[in-house]
């Protein structure tokens, strides 16, 4: 059967142009369908806010078009279907039927599907931005047909299909962007480790980061501050030391080591005579992020971890995203029993009253009792943030002389201590070493960092030691202590001749603790 239109005529040439236009239009619709629909709304918003300059421009042009995804999908598919259905009709006019079928399949497959989709997959953002005005015209032309269909799809499938990554997927996504993954990412090992640690910190509680109470260095309330005690504190190298009353688990407060600088060791002043601070108590089920937020308030950088004996075991609850979360009916304030927190009636008025004192009273130059004050001036709240306003924390002082020894509920068993450094180490996923730490790998006993020698003790201790004679202090060791300097320090072999005023563990920590366990060298000093 011969073709209806003779070759090489004007009509023949017009049909050829129409065929080429149909193939190009079908290919453009197929490429835009794959390229634009593969760009999620979340991805475009990320590019608009934090992409490269050119990507921001391209994403800004595409986003209004892609916003109604079902309408765009229907428009592109309708245009593609019309072009592919019309192509065989025009081919059949200029070539035999068998050749029309062959050419139609070949042209549609190669130039209408494979090539445009390959190009738009690679350069979808750029091509989509260039063709955005043309797509807007198509949306208007095909609106009467595509709009009803898109509404049906919205009703059946819902609007928008933007998918956010779950926590586990986000961690894997970050690891893939690390330079060690070999996938072209430029994130360093430290960056990926910290990001992963920040994501994992949500699922960790105080029990995961605390130091067991048996490994915590602490002092008894009636401990005399003699040479032996001061040497022990100095060799431990911590900035804060918990203080207990009779039982090591009955921790009532803490003492700042810097407050002992002026102590005369020859007078053997009892520890209860020194200025001590209250210590917060946290539940072992309290999330680390909540603990970190409490530490940032400045009341204390160390807390006692307790276990509620009356609390029944609760099974983990699996949420929709697959993450196991603990059922916890207690609020954060109930879990964090901050004994050094300001009373409610005194604390809640700080915002308005401080503003009144720092601005209103400053203008008048008068104090609360009406007396004139010299040098008073206007002070801005911005210069003194609320979280720094009570840095002195006078209400955190523990007055042993005028108040009874703090007592705590019998159903709360102290199981450990936790410091800000413990939380930061969980965030960094690395141990933090300081000048006084000696870390020994608990698996192969390889020393990593040596403890400072006894010769490096403060000169005041050395001078007192040189003036004394006839006695030798026993070997001093430390348990895992509380403070900012070394929160995960494990004990070395304790001295057999230690006074009962200084607590000492009787067993070596198991391998279930941190893989890098801190130790301290035994130090002996002649008195």
Swiss-Prot record:
Residues 37-70, 115-126 are cytoplasmic. It is a multi-pass membrane protein. Residues 210-271, 274-334, 366-435 form the CBS domain. Disulfide bonds: none annotated. This is DUF21 domain-containing protein At1g47330. Residues 502-515 have a biased composition (Polar residues). Residues 8-191 form the CNNM transmembrane domain. GO terms for cellular component: plasma membrane. The modification Phosphoserine is found at residue 315. It holds the Pfam family CNNM. Signal peptide: none annotated. One of its GO terms (biological process) is magnesium ion homeostasis. It comes from Arabidopsis thaliana (Mouse-ear cress). The gene is CBSDUF7.
């Amino acid at each position: 059967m011969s073709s209806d239109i003779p070759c090489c005529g004007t009509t023949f040439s017009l049909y050829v142009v129409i065929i080429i236009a149909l193939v190009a239009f079908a290919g453009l619709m197929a490429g835009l369908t794959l390229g634009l629909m593969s760009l999620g709304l979340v991805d475009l918003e990320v590019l608009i806010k934090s992409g490269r300059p050119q990507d921001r421009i391209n994403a800004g042009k595409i986003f209004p078009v892609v916003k109604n995804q079902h309408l765009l999908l229907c428009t592109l598919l309708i245009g593609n279907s019309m072009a592919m259905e019309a192509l065989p009709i025009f081919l059949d006019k200029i070539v035999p039927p068998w050749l029309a079928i062959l050419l139609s399949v070949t042209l549609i497959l190669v130039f209408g599907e494979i090539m445009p989709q390959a190009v738009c997959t690679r350069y979808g953002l750029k091509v989509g931005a260039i063709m955005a005005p043309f797509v807007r015209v198509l949306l208007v032309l095909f609106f009467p047909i595509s709009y009803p269909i898109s509404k049906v799809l919205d009703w059946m499938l819902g609007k928008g299909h933007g998918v956010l990554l779950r926590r586990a997927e986000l961690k894997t996504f970050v690891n893939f962007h690390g330079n060690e993954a070999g996938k072209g990412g430029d994130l360093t090992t430290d960056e990926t480790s910290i990001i992963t640690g920040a994501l994992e910190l949500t699922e960790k509680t105080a029990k995961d980061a605390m130091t067991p109470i048996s490994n915590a260095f602490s002092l008894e309330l009636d401990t005399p501050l003699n040479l032996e005690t001061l040497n022990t504190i100095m060799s431990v190298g911590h900035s804060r030391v918990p203080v207990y009353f009779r039982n090591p688990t009955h921790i009532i407060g803490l003492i700042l080591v810097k407050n002992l600088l002026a102590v005369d060791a020859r007078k053997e002043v009892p520890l209860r005579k020194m200025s001590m601070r209250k210590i917060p108590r946290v539940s072992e089920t309290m999330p680390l992020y909540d603990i970190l937020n409490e530490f940032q308030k400045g009341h204390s950088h160390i807390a006692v971890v307790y276990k509620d004996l009356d609390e029944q075991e609760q099974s983990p609850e699996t949420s929709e995203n697959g993450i196991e979360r603990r059922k916890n009916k207690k609020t954060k304030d109930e879990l964090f029993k901050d004994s050094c927190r300001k009373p409610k009636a005194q604390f809640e008025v700080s915002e308005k009253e401080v503003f009144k004192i720092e601005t209103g009273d400053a203008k008048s130059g008068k104090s609360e009792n009406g007396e004139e004050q010299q040098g008073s001036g206007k002070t801005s709240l911005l210069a003194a943030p609320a979280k720094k306003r009570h840095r002195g924390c006078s209400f955190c002082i523990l007055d042993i002389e005028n108040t009874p020894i703090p007592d705590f509920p019998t159903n709360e068993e102290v199981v450990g201590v936790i410091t800000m450094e413990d939380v930061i180490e969980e965030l960094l996923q690395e141990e933090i070493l300081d000048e006084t730490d000696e870390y020994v790998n608990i698996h192969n006993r390889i020393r990593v960092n040596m403890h400072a020698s006894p010769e490096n003790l403060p000169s005041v201790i050395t001078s007192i030691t040189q003036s004394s004679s006839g006695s030798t202090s026993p070997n001093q060791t430390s348990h895992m202590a509380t403070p900012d300097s070394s929160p995960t320090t494990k004990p070395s072999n304790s001295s057999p001749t230690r006074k009962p005023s200084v607590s000492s563990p009787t067993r070596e920590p198991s391998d279930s603790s941190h893989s890098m366990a801190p130790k301290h060298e035994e130090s002996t000093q002649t008195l």
